Every structure is written in C-alpha cells, then in structure tokens.
C-alpha cells in the first residue's frame, strides 16, 4: 500500500476539492441561468473568444479543456446547432477539424461574462488579499504545470469498446 498523505496534505486536498466544488456549482448555476450554457460550453466559447478571431483545432481545444474528446465533440455539436460556433475540415490538414466562434457565440459570452465575473469575484477573491491571490495563483500554476507535464490526453490512444475489431 502506498504511503498515506500526512495530515496537512490530507487537509489541503480536501479543502481544495471542496472549494473547487463549491465554486464550480455556483458558476454552473449562473451560466445555465443567464446563458443556457454548460461550463464546458462556456469554456469552449471563452477559449475561442480569446483566440482573437483565429480558429482552433478540436485537438487544441481538447488539450486546453479538461474534458473527454467524445464529450468535447458532443458539446461542440450542441454549440454548432445553436449557431454559436462553426466547425469544418482544416484546409491545411484534412484529418483536423477547426473551430471558430460566430457573432452569436461572442454575444453569448458577452451576455454571461458579467455574472460569471461577479460569482468568481464574490466566492473566490473577496476573502483574499492581493498577495493571497498572487500566492494562490503561483501555487496552483505549479501544481497544474506538474499535472500537465504528462502527455496531453489528446495524445493518448483511444479506448476501444469491448468487441470492437482491431
């Protein structure tokens, strides 16, 4: 059996996961109520908005969004049906699908962003000093970078369902 976490590690782990869970719950409620969006849909739209008019590949999105490839494809399909994004085969690589945000997608982000900022500010940042925010950001960046040092999930082989032919 692996060594147990020490009490400080265990406390930190549980405090972190509880804080993230509480924040995610409120963010999800706000995004759904104000924009009819799931968190993953908002994340896709926000990443495309931040791309400054540049289109991203589905692989780029999958590597930047913590979500399964199949789930991401499904969420992108829902956004496309709503006219919030467009997808097409890359002219540079026929194997790649590129994604861009539409005017309606930008409008949806603009609609939910003020409430999103309000929720995050109230729940996460109100109780922290500017120094705390910098320190937390530094610590979480190191932890995230350590976790992301492994190959991206998009590079992992796809799991085959039972009974599929090789």
Please give the residue ranges for each predicted region.
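N-terminal leader segment of winged-helix/HTH proteins
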Residues: 1-35, 82, 162-166
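Short, hydrophobic-biased segments on the C-terminal half of alpha helices
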Residues: 58, 76-77
